[in-house]
Amino acid sequence: MNTTGYDILRNPFLNKGTAFSEAERQQLGLTGTLPSQIQTIEEQAEQAYKQFQAKSPLLEKRIFLMNLFNENVTLFYHLMDQHVSEFMPIVYDPVVAESIEQYNEIYTNPQNAAFLSVDRPEDVENALKNAAAGRDIKLVVVTDAEGILGMGDWGVNGVDIAVGKLMVYTAAAGIDPATVLPVSIDAGTNNKELLHNPLYLGNKHERIAGEQYLEFIDKFVTAEQNLFPESLLHWEDFGRSNAQVILDKYKESIATFNDDIQGTGMIVLAGIFGALNISKQKLVDQKFVTFGAGTAGMGIVNQIFSELKQAGLSDDEARNHFYLVDKQGLLFDDTEGLTAAQKPFTRSRKEFVNPEQLINLETIVKELHPTVLIGTSTQPGTFTETIVKSMAENTERPIIFPLSNPTKLAEATAEDLIKWTGGKALVATGIPAADVDYKGVTYKIGQGNNALIYPGLGFGLVASTAKLLTQETISAAIHALGGLVDTDEPGAAVLPPVSNLTDFSQKIAEITAQSVVNQGLNREKIVDPKQAVQDAKWSAEY
């Protein structure tokens, strides 16, 4: 460690603040720069938590935590380890949405993020190098913020989602925060509010698209792999026209993962397996209506489709289990404006007596009798009492997942779903939901939050030095999470609670690493995948 004095106190990866020992203060040129009392990290955490508690509202609490991160990374994670359930919705979803909306007004140091401008493609590699600052980067989370949190295009403000995502990676799975890098791709924005905001910090022009955009993405991937050849590249909140295209282009050549396409599909399928474990039913016997056929909705469909094929169904048999509903109603093969992801799962009008009437969700549910209803529409309140009761009339344990977030965009509340179905519904929500007490039973509500699965998956890939992420590995991680449900408990949640996040993230990481090694996709020799995960785990201690 050649850095001394105030340079150390300004470096969040090195700074221990008042916890520096007397010997360290002498050695590092810190004598006289700190109060004389030497604190333990536990004392610092107690002090910081009291400061956190004094903040209100939640956005102020988030700003406090971000400033703490910028000052002392180890203390930040030590504190988060102690309060993971409380901090998760503040560091990440849903409070991060407020942070993104007000990013320009509350701007703080950007947590060591790299900002790449489409207007300066020649600077891409240098920008990544500067942001890494000599650190050995193993995980990159990148966003262009075209599809932030179901909120749409938020330009450079969306960097906060990459920052929050990486904080969850470390808090949940133990990846070393010095080895991660959030990246913002500033391709412009089509958000008029931002373009007219004099404080907006991004490029003040409309988004670039097409060939110019994809060339920039390719330049970024090339530079990222050149600088960090053993890293996992995680794509976050890209728009529906680009997300699948980008994933398809790179997934066969590098270790890469799109959380909105793959992660959302993984967590929903894990929740479905949890529900089916409770109801004692089989995946192949379900009929799925997906309300919202964008990036997230189609990611869910494709993940379930892959699992149905693994269960022995042909492509056509597996596709026949799905009904896609978007703003046009039920999607048919002649519907205008279909995306490439939607086309394989559309229906023929010839299948129905009254196809022209299948334009609203109420009619569709009444006519088709789905057993599983998944919402990624960002249309609040659309899972009405009539629709939900219709489902409950035709299936013993309807699986209903209103996943849109933040809170104001949810299709229904967990409490309503439980009461409208007489306690029959198996529910997961996209936001944290309180327990529901109904007729003497306490129903615990699983949160369909990708944070339940991507930290363990990503850490397992990093720890095993994975070359690629395959469907086999994805399936292994899904089954690991879906098998954690307590089927003997009345009102059991279909997904495990965030309070147990570190425990099951460890299990998912170990199973992921084992899958990588089983397929021979590890770069470095690994004899014991479980030990490799343990050896790579970082702990928030000085």
From Swiss-Prot:
Documented EC number(s): 4.1.1.101
Active site: Y92 (proton donor), K165 (proton acceptor)
pH dependence of activity: Optimum pH is 4.35.
Residues annotated to bind Mn(2+): E236, D237, D260
One GO process term, biological-process aspect: malolactic fermentation
Keywords assigned: Lyase, Manganese, Metal-binding, NAD
Notes on how activity is controlled: Oxamate, fructose-1,6-diphosphate and L-lactate act as non-competitive inhibitors, whereas succinate, citrate and tartrate isomers produce a competitive inhibition.
Binding site residues for NAD(+): A293, G294, T295, A296, N405, N450
GO molecular function, one term: malolactic enzyme activity
Gene Ontology CC annotation, any one: cytosol
Binding site residues for substrate: K165, N450
Catalytic activity from the UniProt record: (S)-malate + H(+) = (S)-lactate + CO2
The UniProt record lists the keyword Nuclease: no
Listed InterPro entries: Aminoacid_DH-like_N_sf, Malic_enzyme_CS, Malic_N_dom, Malic_N_dom_sf, Malic_NAD-bd, Malic_OxRdtase, Malolactic_enz, NAD(P)-bd_dom_sf
Family: Belongs to the malic enzymes family.
Subunit relationships: Homodimer.
Role description: Involved in the malolactic fermentation (MLF) of wine, which results in a natural decrease in acidity and favorable changes in wine flavors. Catalyzes the decarboxylation of L-malate to L-lactate.
Protein name: Malolactic enzyme
Originating organism: Leuconostoc mesenteroides
